[in-house]
Amino acid sequence: QKDVSNQIQSILEKSIPLDPNYTLKGELLGFYAQLEGLSRNTSQPNETALVSGQLTWNAPWGSVFGSGGYLRHAMNGAVVDTDIGYPFSLSLDRNREGMQSWQLGVNYRLTPQFTLTFAPIVTRGYDVRIEGTGILGGMNYRVSEGPLQGMNFFLAADKGREKRDGSTLGDRLNYWDVKMSIQYDFMLK
């Protein structure tokens, strides 16, 4: 085979019960990739490392979380996908050269089926320094009874602002990104 990527990933998780209804959960992700063969590029790094973690406090009403991530070298996503860290945004770059991303958020459960999410994010890094801020808002509803039991509706809106000196779209980007998904899980017996 003339095109190979060697990849290793590890996830460590630990949950600590604080009370019958409260837990603290820590997650740490480590990832390393190295390109061999046709994917190697003389003008770009042929290896990268990613470290990312999240700390979540779970309560009966929802959860509060904080996460962070760091990517050493950006790589072509068709060769190696490094967009796997815990800080989440629909569109803000978290996957560039020397990039850091930090996020704090809350998930609030209005009912057992309906959850709201609010999660600001901050990013820094890249060859041409990108400084981004964003706010992710989301709603999730899961149908719990009737013929559509198991159907899940998800709607998220991301408000992003980035400072990218020299960007073809301008030095300051100010945008909305909206995503909706409908998922229906079922089992054949």
Regions found by a protein language model. Give the residues of each.
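Detector for outer-membrane/organellar transmembrane beta-barrel domains
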Residues: Q7-R124
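Flexible, solvent-exposed loop segments that connect beta-strands
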Residues: S39-S43, D165-G170
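Outer-membrane beta-barrel biogenesis signature
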Residues: N76, N95, S144-M151, M187-K189
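Flexible, surface-exposed loop regions and adjacent strand-edge segments
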Residues: T82-Y86, G132-G134, L169-D177
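A C-terminal functional module that forms or caps the active site or interfaces directly
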Residues: A119, E131-S144, G150-F154
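Outer-membrane beta-barrel "beta-signal"
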Residues: G137-V143, R172-K189
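C-terminal beta-signal and adjacent terminal beta-strands/loops
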Residues: V143, L155-R164
